[in-house]
C-alpha cells in the first residue's frame, strides 16, 4: 500500500521560497506547525482569509496553485491579492509559473559578492555594464521567487544597484544617472525590508546635492538615512560613516567647522564600539577611511599641519588593495604641500598618486591631482611642475581618463 504524497505543490513552493521545514513556514506565518502539516496533507483545508493572504504573499502563488481546492472551505476568491511591488522592479507572480528553487538566491548573491570585490580592481567602464546586467537578472528573478528566497534576492539586487550608482557617481562622474540608480536601489531595499541597506542608499543620495552645494537637500536626505539606521542593528562603523558622509557634504557646502564636529563624533562612535557587526557590503569604510575624510576636511579648513599629520597616518594604514583610496590620500597630501608653498613636495605626492591611478583608475583621485595642478599654476615654469605635466598629460593617463 503506497503512502499518500500529500500536498506536494505546497511543499515544493515552501522549499523554493526558502522555508526548508514546516516549522520555518509556521514561524513566518505566525501559526502552529500542526496547521502547516494539515495544509501539506492529502486533503488540505482552505486557510482562513488573513492567513491565506499571508501565505500567498510569502510563497508568491495563488491558493489553487498551492494545492488548495475551493470546495474544501469557504470561497475566498480564486486568488489572494498580493502587494504591489516598487516601481521599476518586477512584480510578484499571481500564479505558479517558472518558480525558481531556493538555491537561486545563493547563486545570485554569490555574483553580487564577486562584483563587490571586483570594484576595487576592475576598470569602472568594464564592471558597470556587468553590474547593470546582473541587476536586470535580479529584477527578473523577483518575479520568479517568493518568501525568504525573494527577500535575499531583493537585498542583493539593492546592493547591485548601489554598486552601479557608486560607479556612476564616483567613477563615471554622472550624478544624474547615479540619482536614478540610487532610487532603484532604494526600491529594492524596500522589497527586502532591509533598513540598513536603505540607510546606506539614502546617504549616497545625499552626495548628489551635497557635492553641488545644496546643503538643505543633502541634510534632508541625511535625516532620512539616520532614521533608517535607527530601525536596524546598525554597527559603529555604519553610524560613523553616516557622520563622514554628512561631514563631506558640509565641507563641500563651506562649513568645515560643522564637518570637523561630525568627524569627531564619528571617531567617538568607533572608539566606543558596539555590539553589532558591520554588514558585508560596508566595504567602502573603515577607521582609516574616516581619517582620510578628516584629513581632507582639515585641508579645506586650512589646518595644514594637522591635515599633513592625519593624511600621513591614513596613508601608512591603508592596505595594499586600497589603491583607489591611496590615490585620493596622496592627492590630498599634494594639496597640503601646494597650499603650504612646497611645490617640489606637492609634485612628488601628485606623481605617486598618478602611479596609483595607472594601476587602478579612480576619477575622484584624478580630480585631486588636477586640483593640485591648478594650485601650482604660479610655479608652472619649474622643472618639477613640467615633469608633473608630462605625466598628467601622457598618453597612458590621457587615454585612461577618456576611456574609463
Residue ranges and their predicted role:
Residues 1-20, 24, 53, 64:
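A short, Lys/Arg-rich alpha-helix, primarily the initiator
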Residues 2-9, 31, 110, 160, ...:
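Alpha-helix N-cap/N′ positions at the starts of helices
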Residues 13, 28, 39, 69:
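Residues in the recognition helix of alpha-helical DNA-binding motifs
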Residues 30, 49-65:
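DNA major-groove recognition helix of helix-turn-helix/homeodomain DNA-binding modules
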Residues 30-47:
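Recognition helix of helix-turn-helix/homeodomain-like DNA-binding domains
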Residues 57, 64-110:
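Compositionally biased, long intrinsically disordered regions
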Residues 99-105, 109-404:
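Conserved binding/catalytic microenvironments
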